[in-house]
Regions:
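Two-component/phosphorelay signaling modules centered on CheY-like receiver
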Residues: 1-17, 133-174
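Conserved phosphotransfer microenvironments
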Residues: 2, 11-13, 18-65, 69-80, ...
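Generic structural signal for beta-strand residues in well-ordered domains
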Residues: 9, 30-31, 58, 83, ...
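Short, solvent-exposed linear motifs at loop/edge-of-secondary-structure regions
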Residues: 14-34, 117-146
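Output/docking surface of receiver
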Residues: 18-20, 43, 66-134, 151, ...
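Short alpha-helical interface elements
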Residues: 50, 63, 81, 112-115, ...
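Generic recognition of short, well-ordered alpha-helical segments
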Residues: 51, 102, 137-140
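Hydrophobic, Leu/Ile/Phe/Ala-enriched alpha-helical segments that form helix-helix packing faces
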Residues: 56, 107, 111, 142-150, ...
């Protein structure tokens, strides 16, 4: 992950704290200050992950909870039987560090969207995709493209303050996994959207 940050000219890579059980996660959240996100690995034998997500959301509604899993038909079947409302996003993860970087940047963009897009006028790209497997593939590539382009711009002769402003003004990425969220984000930020990326089949299906 540190190498990914370095390659993309990003500063302040996140610090990760690893625990093995839901009980350890609860204890950590109660004792450690400054945790910005919870990432949880899931397999079909897990029984506590969904109750843990609900507990965390009840205590800290604004703390992002992300589920990482190796997707298969059995995983899809198990997830369909669970209440996943407390989980912000699910991602298909196969050990690729670039996905972790994309997840961190996605939530940073979401957190800063109101100020940067609506307030300052920073542009944005809206990705509309309901397939966990597909958006888990798209996001890392999309962020790499944007961040590498930003890095190229920073090779120009700029002072430190100008570099900081240019980094901050890169296009934000917004992810919608259903039609209602996509429409809401579009209506809210349409004046600053560079474009919308979506599966045509998804749009036709949702549009009737």
């Amino acid at each position: 992950i540190y190498r990914e940050y370095t390659d993309l000219n990003l500063s302040n890579p996140p610090k990760f704290i690893w625990v093995q059980t839901a009980a350890q996660a609860r204890e950590l959240l109660n004792t450690v200050v400054g945790i910005d996100m919870v990432m949880c690995m899931y397999n079909v034998s897990d029984k506590e992950v969904f109750s843990l997500a609900t507990e965390i959301k009840n205590d800290r509604p604004n703390l992002p909870f992300v589920l990482l899993t190796h997707f298969s038909k059995e995983v899809y079947r198990r997830l369909a039987l669970q209440d996943t409302s407390a989980i912000d996003y699910m991602f298909c993860w196969h050990g690729n560090a670039d996905l972790i970087v994309a997840i961190v940047k996605l939530f940073e963009d979401l957190q800063n969207a109101e100020h940067d897009i609506s307030g300052v006028g920073v542009q944005a790209i809206l990705l509309v995709e309901d397939s966990v497997r597909y958006y888990s593939t798209y996001l890392p590539e999309l962020y790499k493209l944007i961040l590498m382009q930003t890095r190229e711009f920073l090779t120009e002769t700029l002072n430190q303050q100008q570099r900081k402003i240019r980094k901050r003004s890169r296009p934000k990425i917004l992810l919608a996994t259903n039609y209602d969220d996509a429409l809401s984000m579009y209506e809210k930020y349409k004046n600053n959207l560079l474009g919308v990326i979506s599966d045509v089949g998804f749009c036709e299906h949702r549009g009737g």
